């Protein structure tokens, strides 16, 4: 099993969710996060003053899938979340040793 974590622009969430659900993904976790990458924040104006926002609002999507689904999930994330501009985000893939569904006690593949 693998955990796919994607950092995306907030306004892309609906598009990403639809793409993943249509591809058969039945669960995901979404968290509000803040960070910066190459774009290093942005300059904004408020009441005539200019200030720099160093950490930008993003969303983190976490999905645990069988190894055979990873490439498909990554393809769906990239196609749905891409704008072509700096700040589109990143995808991280890491191994998952085990999963337990708390309600039933099911483990691993049956739990996802």
Swiss-Prot record:
Keywords attached to this entry: Nucleotide-binding, Phosphoprotein, Transcription, Transcription regulation
One Gene Ontology term from the biological process aspect of the record: regulation of nitrogen utilization
Protein modification: Phosphorylation dependent on the nitrogen source and spectral light quality.
Record-level Gene Ontology MF annotations: ATP binding; enzyme regulator activity
Pfam families associated with the record: P-II
Residues that bear Phosphoserine: 49
Gene3D superfamilies (alphabetical): 3.30.70.120
GO cellular component annotations of the record: cytosol
Modification O-UMP-tyrosine occurs at: 51
InterPro entries: N-reg_PII, N-reg_PII-like_a/b, N-reg_PII/ATP_PRibTrfase_C, N-reg_PII_CS, N-reg_PII_urydylation_site
Known role: P-II indirectly controls the transcription of the GS gene (glnA). P-II prevents NR-II-catalyzed conversion of NR-I to NR-I-phosphate, the transcriptional activator of glnA. When P-II is phosphorylated, these events are reversed. In nitrogen-limiting conditions, when the ratio of Gln to 2-ketoglutarate decreases, P-II is phosphorylated which allows the deadenylation of glutamine synthetase (GS), thus activating the enzyme.
The family this protein is said to belong to: Belongs to the P(II) protein family.
Name of the protein: Nitrogen regulatory protein P-II
Originating organism: Synechocystis sp. (strain ATCC 27184 / PCC 6803 / Kazusa)
This protein's encoding gene: glnB
